[in-house]
Regions:
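Short loop/edge segments at beta-strand edges and connector loops
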Residues: 5
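Acidic, low-complexity, intrinsically disordered interaction modules
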Residues: 15-73
Length: 73
């Protein structure tokens, strides 16, 4: 499965009313300048996960990326 843009993920989320947004993993990844830098990268294929997208977050150590998923579980 590939990481897609947030807009594409929200479109999938709206198409499936039973879906919800959930963190894909617990890790934090270094910020690379834009979320498009992460689009197209391969991630593990997990049953029930419809899409994975990168989301920018910020804490006391600075900006980072968190992978979020659109899931049916």
């Amino acid at each position: 499965m590939k990481i897609i843009t947030r807009g594409e993920a929200m479109r999938i989320h709206r198409q499936h009313p039973a879906s919800r947004l959930f963190p894909f993993c617990t890790g934090k990844y270094r910020w690379q300048g834009s979320t498009e830098a992460y689009a197209g990268r391969e991630v593990q294929d997990i049953p029930g996960v419809l899409a994975v997208f990168a989301e920018r977050r910020k804490d006391s150590f600075g900006p980072y990326v968190r992978l979020m998923s659109v899931t049916l579980n």
